[in-house]
Amino acid sequence: MKFLAFGLIYFHFCILNRCEYITSSTIQKCYNSSNEPNNCSQKAVIVLSLENGQIANTEQVVATLNQLSDSGVNKQLQNSFIFEVTKSPVTALFPLIYLQDFNSQPLEQVIATTLFSCKDGFYDSSPTCKFQYDSKGQKILDSQGYCCYCSLSDILGMGNDLSRGKVCYALNLGAGSATAHCLKFSPLWYSAFKIQQYQLYFEVNINIYTVDSQNQKNLKQTLKLSTSNPTMKSSDNSTISKIIGTFTPTQPPADLSSYYLVKPSFPATDPRVLQGISSWMFVDKTMFTLDGTQCNKIGVSYSGFRQQSSSCSQPVGSCLQNQLENLYQSDLILLSQNKQPKYLLESQGNFNQVQFQGQTILQQGLSGSASTLITIEIDAAQIKFVTNLGIGCISQCSINNFESHSGNGKLVALVQNQGNYSAEFVLGFNCSSNVQPIQGQKLFLTANQLYNFNCSVSVNSDISAINNNCTINLYDAIGNQLDSKNILFNTTSTNHTSNQGNNTGQQQSSQEYKSSQSCSDKCSSFWSFWCYFSAGCIKEAFKSIASIAGVASALALVIFLAKNGYLVPIIRFLCCCCCKSKKKENEKNKDKTDKKSIQESCSYDRSCCSHSISQSYQVENKNKYKRSKIQRSFSSESCQDKSKKIINELSNLEETFEANKLYANIDKNSSIFEYFGFKKSFTFILYERNDILFLPQNSTILDMIGALQPQKGSYLAQKFLEIVNKNALKVVSTSPLYLLIE
C-alpha cells in the first residue's frame, strides 16, 4: 500500500491585494468494497459552512495539489485543481392541495311584492327569486330564497319591530306588504388551497477547474447538490461532495397550519386575477363554512342563507358578513395607513408561487442565518480558502415614530457594497433597554450593490417614550466594523380598546346561540300562521289562529257596543268604580294625618265644650241614605246648638253636597268632632277641637278660601262664605283652613 505525503494546506482570506494564511491539516480515508478490497487512498476533506443567500464568488474554495511523496521521493505535480462553491438562497416550500372555490362577495337582492304574490316554495313553478340550476340541470335546493311578510300588527298599525327589507304601512295589503330575499353571487371567485408542512430547499453548485502549466484555468465539470440530491460524485471519481445538514434557520418559516391560501382564479380577465400573488391572502380556517350552512362565513350557500335564524327580523345582509371581499378591502385600508395588513401574503413574510416537480408550490424566502455544512473530498495537497472582505457603508437609516405594541414600527436602512468584489456583510443592532432586541442580519452583496434592508421594531413598554435609540453597525465577514449609525425615534402610549363596551373593562350582556332552530326561529312573527303551517309547526299555527280569532272577536264586540251606545257608559262606570275606591282610600289616610296635625298644632285654650256631660243623638243624611250615631260631650246647651247648627247648614248645600254618606263622631281622648261628607266633586272634612273647625286643603277648599275675598269664588264658595259670616266663624289659617267658633 502506498501512502502519499502532503504538504501544507493554506486558507487565503483576501482583501484586494492583502492576504492572510492559516494552516490546516489533512486526513487519511480508506474505502473498502467487494470489488476492490482494501483500496485505500489519501483524501483531503474540506468542510464548509455556507450561509443563506450566498452568490457567485462570495465564497470560493481553491484546492491545489503540488507535490507527492513516493518511496521517500517528493514529486511536484504539474497541474492543480480549483473548486468554486456557491449556495442559493434558502427557501421554504409549502405544497398546496386544492380545496374548493369561494365567491368573493355574496349579495342579497330584495324584491318588493305583496302578501298574496310572494312565492318561495320549492315546488312553486315560478318562485319570486327564480330557481338556480346545477351543471346537470337540477334545481339547487333553497336557491329560491324566502319571503318576509308584514305581520297582522303591522297591518293594524301597531307593529314596531324591525322588518327585513320592507316598510310596512297600516292597512296596506298591496305592494310592499311582502318582500322576496334572493342570494346572488358576485362575478369574482377565489380558489382555496390547503397548505402542507414546509420543506427547506436550496442548491449548492461546485465548479471544478484544472490549471495547466501556463496557469490557464479550465472547467472540468460541475457538481450540483440540493436538498433533493444531497450527494454527487465527479465523473472521474476524483471528487465526492455531500450535504451534511442545515442548521435550523434563526428566522424559521411561518406556521401556516391554521390557514387556507385563497387566490383570485376566475374570470381570468378580472383585474384582481391579473394582479397575481399580490392579491392572494392567508385566511384562518375558522372563517370558512365548507358545507355552506353557516351565516357570516366565507362559503355561505343558498341553504345557509335561506335557513338563517329569525331571518325576517334581521337587517338586510345580516347573513353575508366577513366575506373575502371584506377582508381584502380592510387590508387595502391598512396599507393606505402604512400599517401591516392582516390577510395579504406579506403579513406572514416574503412569498412567491413556483412550479416544483410539476406541482404548484408556495415559496417563502427566508432571511437570517441558515448555515449548511457540506464536505468535498478531493485528492489534493494544498487548499486555499478565499473569502472576499468587502468595503461598505450605511448610506441612510431611519425608524418611524409609532404606537407601543402596535406592530407598526419599521426600521429602514440602505447598505452599499463599495468594493469591486461580491462580499459578505453583517448588520448588528444595539438598542435602548425598552426596545425589543433586533436580530443581526448577514448580507451578501455584489460589487457596488445598494441594498434596502427593513425589519420590524417593537418596544416593551405601554407608555410613551421620547428619544428611543438604536445603533446600527456594519461589519465585514471577519467582524471588522465598517460603519455605524445611531437612530432616535419616539413611541406613543398603547391605545387600549375593547369591542365589549365603550371603554376597556366594560361588559355587555352575553349572547346565547341556539344550535337548532325552533318554530319561533323559523317564523319571525307570532301572527304568521301560514308560516307555521309551512314549517310543520301545527300546534303553533293553531295558537296563532286562535289568537287572531280572539283579537277579531274583541274588536267586533267593541264596535258593536260603540255602535249601540253602550261603550261610553261602560267605560264611565268602570272609571267611576276605580276612582271611588282609590279616592276613599286616599281620604281615609288623609283624615288620619289631618287629625293628628290638629291635635299637635292647635293650642287654643278657649272652650265652649267640656267633657262633663255626655249625650248621644243622631243626624240623618238629608239625601235619604244612612244614619250615624254622634257622640258628643258639651258643657252648655248653647255650644251644642251652635255646633249642630253649623253642621246642618253645611249639609243643606244641596247643590254640591250630594252625599251618599254622612256621619259624625267624637274622639273621647282628643275631643275632636269630625264631620265627613263624601261628594261627587270633593271630600269635605270638618274638625272641631275645643272651638276650631278644620277643612283639609284641596281644589274645592282653595276655591272656598278664595271666596273670603270680595267678588271671587264659585257659587259653592259663596254659599260657604255665607255660612262663615252668618255664624261669625273666624278664619285662623288658610293653609290648612282653620275656623274658630266665636
From Swiss-Prot:
Organism of this sequence: Tetrahymena thermophila
Region (Important for membrane fusion): 152-179
Family: Belongs to the HAP2/GCS1 family.
Further comment: HAP2/GCS1 family members mediate membrane fusion between gametes in a broad range of eukaryotes, ranging from algae and higher plants to protozoans and cnidaria, suggesting they are derived from an ancestral gamete fusogen. They function similar to viral fusogens, by inserting part of their extracellular domain into the lipid bilayer of an adjoining cell.
InterPro entries: HAP2/GCS1, HAP2/GCS1_dom
Signal peptide as annotated in the record: 1-19
Membrane topology label: Single-pass type I membrane protein
Gene name for this UniProt entry: HAP2
Alphabetical list of Pfam families matching this protein: HAP2-GCS1 (PF10699)
Function noted in UniProt: During fertilization, required for the formation of intercellular membrane pores and subsequent exchange of gametic pronuclei between cells. Probably initiates the formation of intercellular membrane pores by inserting part of its extracellular domain into the cell membrane of the adjoining cell in the mating pair. Mating requires the presence of HAP2 on at least one of the two cells. Mating efficiency is high when HAP2 is present on both cells, and is strongly reduced when HAP2 is present on only one of the two cells.
Keyword Disulfide bond: yes
Compartments in which it is found: Cell membrane; Cell junction
Keywords: Cell junction, Cell membrane, Disulfide bond, Fertilization, Lipid-binding, Membrane, Signal, Transmembrane, Transmembrane helix
Cytoplasmic side: 562-742
Record has Signal as a keyword: yes
Disulfide links within the chain: C30-C40, C118-C147, C129-C182, C148-C312, C150-C168, C295-C319, C431-C470
Domains: entry comment: The region that is important for membrane fusion binds to lipids and can insert itself into lipid membranes. It is unstructured in an aqueous environment and assumes a more ordered, beta-stranded conformation in the presence of lipid membranes.
Phylogenetic classification of the source organism: Eukaryota, Sar, Alveolata, Ciliophora, Intramacronucleata
An MF annotation (GO) of this entry: fusogenic activity
Extracellular compartment spans: 20-540
A GO BP entry: single fertilization
Protein name: Hapless 2
GO cellular component: cell-cell junction; plasma membrane
Transmembrane domains' residue ranges: 541-561
